[in-house]
Amino acid sequence: GGAGFPTGMKWGFIPQGDNKEHYFVVNADESEPGTCKDTPLMMANPHVLIEGIIIGSYAIRANHAFIYIRGEVAHVISRVQQAIEDAYKAGYLGKNILGKGFDLELVLHVGAGAYICGEETALLDSLEGFRGQPRLRPPFPAIAGLYARPTIVNNVETVASVPSIIENGPEWFAAIGTEKSKGYTLYSLSGHVNNPGQFEAPLGITLREILELAGGIRDGHKLKFW
């Protein structure tokens, strides 16, 4: 999960048998300067993100989910909104999904682009219609999040990884990466490399290997710092 915190443990913090509304929120507010991994992921395959949201919402018993996205990325907003509409038409969202008795409404919320809304509690304030400001913790969102109800906030990459783990099993995922950092992640390379872009690779990959994925340093340039 985000910052390396185990996602399963985070989902497990949601109270059981509390008879309260639960919420599942995806933080797609990619606001760090130079960060550009969520945008290409959502453009390439928004459906895998929606599938992860459905699985996560079912796991924490949430019937309402949100994707919070920056207003500047109009092309991504259009792409994700179309994918949501496709999912509704296919019966993967809405009432009584696939006849299984599970309801899920998914809303794409377009933010105003405030940098601070990348922080999860400021994002929740913004979703509620207030100015985004970080909240004092505790309580944490899993106990009192959106509308003071139990809420999970995950980033795009985390949620999009869920379907492949469900399909292939936790042992498959744990076999990737290193002993202390299992799995894979997205790396963004820019600057003077031959093939700048985003690369999915195991955690623990070396800088040399990442540069090789990007085709190496361009002629006439040297690696100055990392």
List each language-model region with its residue ranges:
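Short loop-to-beta-strand transition segments
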Residues: K10, A65, G216-W226
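Hydrophobic alpha-helical positions that pack around
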Residues: I77-L203, G215-R218
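Short amphipathic, charge-patterned alpha-helical segments
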Residues: G52-G56, L203-R218
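Iron-sulfur-cluster electron-transfer modules
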Residues: G2-R131
